Structures are given as C-alpha cells and as structure tokens.
Regions:
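C-terminal ends and interior cores of transmembrane alpha-helices
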Residues: 87-102, 310-326
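Conserved MFS/SLC helix-loop-helix module at the cytosolic interface between two early adjacent transmembrane helices
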Residues: 64-105
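Cytoplasmic helix-loop-helix junction between adjacent transmembrane helices
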Residues: 111-151
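Central cavity-lining transmembrane alpha-helices of secondary-active solute carriers
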Residues: 56-71, 274-287
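Extracytoplasmic gate region of multi-pass secondary transporters
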Residues: 33-34, 230-287, 342, 346, ...
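Helix-loop-helix hairpin linking two adjacent transmembrane segments in secondary transporters
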Residues: 146-198
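Glycine-rich segments within core transmembrane alpha-helices of 12-TM secondary carriers
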Residues: 140-162, 166, 280-284, 370-380
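A late C-terminal transmembrane helix in Major Facilitator Superfamily
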Residues: 284, 354-390
Length: 433
C-alpha cells in the first residue's frame, strides 16, 4: 500500500462490503425456491403450471417494485431507502416458513410477490450507494465487486440448501429463516455504519476529497421520474437491461437445459453451476476494472464504457452454438463465458447512469430500466415455455441464438441514443464542456 493510499483511506470499501453482503443475501434468498423446486413440487403436489405461477409472481412484483422503489430511495435517501427494501424482503422471506400445505400455492405466490417488491430495491440502492461513495473513475470497478455477489449467492444456495434440506423435504423452512436472520443482522450493521460521505464522522478529509474529485455540486431537490422518461439517456440505459432476461435464462432454465441435453441431474448440477458462476464473477470484476483502468489512462468515459461493452458483446457470441455442441463441458464453458460477458456488460451498463445523471436521479433511472428488463424476462419465459411445449428441445436453439446476438444489437442502439454520453445537470440539461 502506497503512502498516498494510506493517507486517502479506504472507508468507502467498508460501505461497499455491506452492499456486497446485501446483494449476496438477495440472490441467495431469490434462489432458494429454484433450488428446492423438485422437493417442494413433490411435497406440496404442485404442477409445473403452479410452479411457473410462483416464479411469475416474483418477477411481476420485482418489475413493479423497481419503478417505485427507486423513487422511494431517491426521496428518502440511501440509508433509509435501502433499509426499507431489505426489511420488506426479510419479512416476506421468513413468511415462506409459515406456509401450511393446504395453502402452499397461494401462500408461496403471496410470499414471492412480497419478496419481489422488497428485493427490487437492492440494485437501485446499491448503484446509488456507489455513486455517493466512489468517484466516476472507480464506479465500474466498485459496481463489479458488489455485482459479483449475485453469483456468490447463486453458488451458495444449492450447497447450503442441499446440506440442510432432506430429499423428502424435511427442514425446508430453515433456509428461509436463515436468510431472514442474516438480513436482520445486515440492517443493524447498515444503520450503524452508513452516513453520506459529507457528514460521516469516520471519513477522512482526504478520502472525501477523493470521492468528490470528479463530482459536481448538486441541489437537494428530487427529480420526479416522469421528467426522466423523455430523456434519451434513460432509454439508452433501459436498453442495456433487456439482457437481464438472458441472465435469468441461465439462472432459471440452465439446469433444465443441461438435464435435457446432457443428462445432468440434481446430484451433479453443482460443479457445472460452480464453473458458470465463478466465471461470471471473474467477468464482473474484470469488466469493472477494465473500463476504470482505461479512464485512468486518459480515455473518455464514453469510449472506455462502450469499448468494454463491445468486447463483452463479442465474447458472448459463441454461446449461440451451445445447443449443437456434443460436449457437456464445452457447453458449460461457453455458457460460463457468456455469463462472464454478461456480468461485465451489466456493471458497465449500470455505471452509465451515474456517469450521465445527477446522483439524485440515479436510483429512479435504474428502477425504470430494470422494470423494463424484468418485463421482457417475463415475456421471454412465457414464450420459451410455449415453444418448448410445441417444438420440444429445438426451442433452445432460438433461445441461445437470441442470448448470443442481442448484446451487439442493443449496443448499437445505445450508441445511437447516447453517442457522446454528455452529463446532465440537476435540471436535466446538458453540461457543456
């Protein structure tokens, strides 16, 4: 550690660690039902249609919640807004454990809906936290660190749940209670630790100056989301979130595809998923580091972000060939490579918002974009299910073609909408250099 680094300090990374913890809990909680799906379906006599209704309930709530949770976080501030989000998902997460067999379907639909509302606040709050605590040149890397925790949560879920829950469903309630307790612990740590950098008593003057080194002065007036919708920059970011459906395809349909294509079962799905999500984590960290390093070398933010996203789009292309590959491990590698590219794409896409918008609009813009991404993911799930029912496994061919090619197409439209990434001031007017 250099003398300059010691002088500046690193308290901002304590805040980032809490965001990492929250996002890990978020994805672990989200993955529990998917991991236990075969056991729960047998235990509660659910049909596939019943299970689909539970999943769609979560996604609908998540999409709707993204719209207003972002606004709540912008209006109430990051500290209170993030707390409200995780308290909601803690309550509904633990509510799963109280559901009785006679009301299992409606109970899980309600619980997943509430969970979706609460969890929808995580990413808007996390991005806003990074915008408040990191200078622009470090935001992509910081976003990459916390975004990597999505894979951590997805990796931990099958191992922890498998160690607790028996094959016949004994102890199925315990994972929901564990996540509720972890979330409660997080709330205590968050309320004790978080303040805005400008008023935080443990932040050095040198670190505060570093955080604000490339930030503009802003007013405290909040920007209504209706004023954000006409901005091309809002829709440029929203387009990048359309790829969320691809990520959820890997997360929720990946195990099913590997089972039907390569005979992978619940006992040996762990290693393929471990490889895929570790690669995703590596992509998340590398993507954030790369664009940040390019900015530090003198590249414009516009060039650094878009070139990094272009590289991501290119390395994702080979996943289109997965349905025609005979080797399970080559298929796993290509899915992992695509997951890595997606995570790198995603964190650079997120940082477009604080790069362009004032801090007070960040959570709302993120919420608008993510809501659109979830809506597309819901439509994609319905369409894929229908195609698989009518055309069989050949439906995966088109799913992977879209998953592989969509990033390049979307990046082209992002550049058309936002060719120069000119920053906006508090009144959403362009800041002239």
């Amino acid at each position: 550690m250099t003398e300059l680094t010691q002088k500046i300090g690193h308290y901002r990374y304590r805040i980032l660690a809490l965001v990492f913890m929250a996002t890990t809990i978020n994805y672990f909680d989200r993955s529990i039902v998917a991991v236990m799906a075969p056991t729960l379906q047998k235990l509660f006599d659910w049909s596939n249609k019943d299970y689909a209704a539970i999943m769609v309930s979560f996604k609908i709530a998540y999409g709707l919640g993204l719209l207003f949770m972002g606004g709540i976080i912008d209006r109430l501030g990051t500290k209170i807004g993030y707390t409200i989000s995780i308290v909601i998902w803690s309550i509904f997460g633990m509510l799963h454990a109280a559901i009785r067999p006679a009301f299992s379907l409606i109970g899980f639909i309600v619980a997943r809906f509430g969970l979706g509302i609460g969890e929808s606040g995580n990413f808007p709050a996390a991005i806003k936290t990074v915008a408040e605590w990191f200078p622009k040149k470090d935001r992509a890397f910081a976003t990459g660190i916390f975004d990597a925790s999505t894979s951590v949560g997805a990796i931990l879920a099958p191992f922890i749940v498998g160690a607790i829950v028996s094959v016949n469903g004994d102890n199925w309630q315990i994972p929901f209670l564990i996540t509720g307790l972890l979330s409660s612990l997080w709330v205590v740590l968050w309320l004790k630790t978080y303040q805005k950098p400008e008023v935080h008593p443990k932040l050095s003057k040198e670190e505060l100056a570093y955080i604000n080194s490339d930030s503009e002065e802003e007013t405290t007036e909040k920007i209504p989301w209706v004023k954000l919708l006409p901005k091309r920059e809002t829709w440029a970011f929203a387009l990048t979130t359309l790829t969320d459906g691809v990520w959820w395809f890997y997360l929720f349909w990946g195990a099913k595809f590997l089972a039907e294509q390569f005979g992978v079962n619940i006992q040996n799905i762990g290693l393929p998923f471990l490889i895929i999500f570790i690669m995703a984590d590596m992509g998340s960290l590398l993507g954030g580091y790369t664009s940040g390093a390019l900015i530090k070398k003198g590249w414009t933010i516009n060039k650094a972000r878009k070139i990094t996203m272009l590289v991501c789009a290119i390395i994702i292309l080979p996943v289109s060939f997965v349905p025609v590959i005979a080797s399970k491990w080559i298929a796993v590698f290509l899915i992992g490579l695509a997951a890595a590219g997606h995570e790198s794409w995603s964190i650079n896409g997120y940082t477009l918002v604080p790069d362009v918008f004032p801090k007070k609009a960040v959570a709302s813009v993120i919420g608008i974009g993510k809501m659109l991404g979830v809506a597309v993911a819901i439509i994609a799930d319905i369409a894929l299910g229908a195609v698989l029912d009518t055309a069989g496994n050949s439906g995966y061919f088109w799913a992977f073609i879209i998953a592989g090619s969509s990033y390049l197409v979307i990046l082209g439209f992002v550049h058309l909408l936002m060719p120069k990434m000119t920053p906006l001031d508090d009144n959403l007017n362009y800041i002239k250099n």
